[in-house]
Swiss-Prot record:
Gene3D superfamilies: 30s Ribosomal Protein S19, Chain A. HAMAP family: Ribosomal_uS19. GO terms for biological process: ribosomal small subunit assembly; translation. This is Small ribosomal subunit protein uS19. Signal peptide: none annotated. GO terms for molecular function: rRNA binding; structural constituent of ribosome.
Amino acid sequence: MPRSLKKGPFVDHHLMKKVLEQNEKGTKNVIKTWSRRSMVVPEMIGHTIAVHDGRKHVPVFITEAMIGHKLGEFAPTRTFRSHVKEDRRSRR
């Protein structure tokens, strides 16, 4: 179920503070965050945010199409190792 519109989007305060500081200074440094639950807001457009996937930080460049989505959607947590095709010769 989506979040109520009257509440507005959720963004962790420490992340929003870093984004606003960089907007004031005009810099575009990579921002590291563990906050996968934070929603992408218009102030983040053009920034690169490194989102933690449980093992490393995955750099995500924020575009207009990402507004309203959560940061965790762009950093997959599971790595899929393809199913190995069975070799018929080795079974005999």
